[in-house]
Regions:
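Structured soluble/peripheral alpha/beta segments that form catalytic or ligand/cofactor-binding pockets
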Residues: 1-299
Length: 299
């Protein structure tokens, strides 16, 4: 499926379904500093509301109240684009080159600011793009700076960005892992949807100048004492017949709930893919499954 420059802007709901949603996510992971970040607007135009979560986290600072910065805003007015720029509660996205290059800034005066340039390293990976529903992912290089109450930290890392639009119920039952690794020469994305009676895999392997869809992937997980994924190996194959084995270990973690329907452990991972890559392992649970799992620990 293909995109055009209009897909970099907000989409018009095709139904009056109140849970019709649109997200516009940017992220970064900088192995030199150990810092990861996320900028996550969630729009529900049929309800005329929006939400925003901005977070930066580091090793051993894994909660919203111990992270260097974490703030969520709810019940905001949905933003609109004015030319190539949209603004939402201190966050600004400027489209410098549609589908390829962006200027991301954030201002929480006297507390935290971000000034980042995000450049696509490859074409968008597009599982679906219709007026009714869409999703795509793009590996990026992220360069710029963060400022924590006067302390400036340079950022030079990688990130995935994604866009989604269409109905998204807060009452969905979901168990997902969203996993990626990126360097200047390639990237991979492995998305596992784990249902009670099925397990589906999607994503891609982009290596040696060739991108191909992943057709099989099995993961072997190690967890720490807090049940966070600490190490994982993926073994599988892609549509071109290439077999792969990719192993990574966690550098940091953040307990994050950016929307009512999903909780995730967001973890920076360093991978042995393509002579070294960085990315994230996002361990995603809907609240019902998380509650069931946690209740098993009751005595």
């Amino acid at each position: 499926m293909t995109l055009n420059s209009a897909d970099d802007y907000f989409h018009v709901p095709t139904t009056d379904e109140r849970w019709w949603s649109e997200t516009y996510w940017f992220s970064f992971d900088d192995p030199a500093t150990g810092l990861s970040g996320t900028f996550y607007p969630l729009l529900r135009k049929n309800l005329d509301i929006a939400a925003l979560t901005v977070a930066v986290w580091a090793p051993d600072q894994a909660t919203s109240w111990t992270a260097p910065y974490c703030r969520s805003y709810w019940h905001l007015k949905p933003p609109v684009f004015e030319g190539n720029t949209m603004a939402l509660e201190g966050l600004t996205y400027e489209i410098l080159d549609p589908l390829h290059r962006y200027h991301v800034t954030y201002q929480d005066p006297n507390v935290f600011t971000a000034d980042l340039t995000v450049t696509g390293l490859a074409d968008n990976y597009v599982p679906i793009a219709t007026p009714e529903r869409g999703h795509w992912d793009q590996p990026t290089r992220v360069v710029g700076s963060l400022n924590f109450a006067g302390r400036e930290i340079p950022i030079d890392g990688f990130g995935m960005r994604d866009r989604s639009w269409g109905p998204r119920l807060d009452s969905n039952t979901a168990r997902t892992s969203y996993v990626y690794g990126i360097n200047n020469d390639g990237s991979f994305l492995i998305v596992s949807q784990m249902q009670q009676d099925s397990h589906t895999i999607s994503g891609y392997l982009d290596q040696d100048g060739e991108r191909s869809r992943i057709v099989t992937a099995e993961q072997f997980i190690e967890r720490d004492s807090s049940q966070r994924v600490s190490r994982v190996t993926f073994e599988g194959s892609d549509q071109s017949g290439r077999d792969f084995s990719i192993t990574g270990h966690a550098r940091n973690h953040l307990a994050k709930q950016a929307s009512p329907g999903y909780f995730a452990w967001m973890s920076m991972f360093e991978w042995d893919f393509a002579d070294g890559a960085v990315g994230q392992y996002q361990d995603v649970w809907s609240p019902d499954l998380l509650s069931i799992e946690a209740s098993r620990q009751l005595t």
